[in-house]
């Protein structure tokens, strides 16, 4: 059949799979969708996320570093994870809990996030906070976020927000959002 012959042509070409996937008849790409819009709720988009952003090496014995955040943000990540635990002298730290990984001060991590959050992307940044701190260090954590991020941190609903519906990336602009558990 003609259809089978057309498919065989794709198989014989050196870049056959790419040709097949970008063809008008079979392509995953559709020209009508080439220009993204940013007016739908944030939950309507795929978000480039980084899990265990702070870890270099294994998650049981690796090093926790600020460089992991810098690298993820420069590569366009729009969601980074911060595992926050109690640190000495009342200062929260980022580490992979109950493991042999090293610790990095939360203050250093948030300073790096503030510096690199919007260098490679203008889209909102989500801070996924996993908070294991006692109440006193939770207050310090909140203070660090407010102080280091300033106006970049969304601390209240935006004007005209619809309850239960996330605003669009267009509406957030260059803002940092936090989600804690």
Protein language model regions, located:
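Single conserved hydrophobic/aromatic residue that forms the stacking wall/gate
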Residues: 1-10
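Chitinase-like catalytic core of GlcNAc-active glycosidases
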Residues: 36-164, 172-175, 179-180
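EF-hand and EF-hand-like Ca2+-sensor regions
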Residues: 11-45
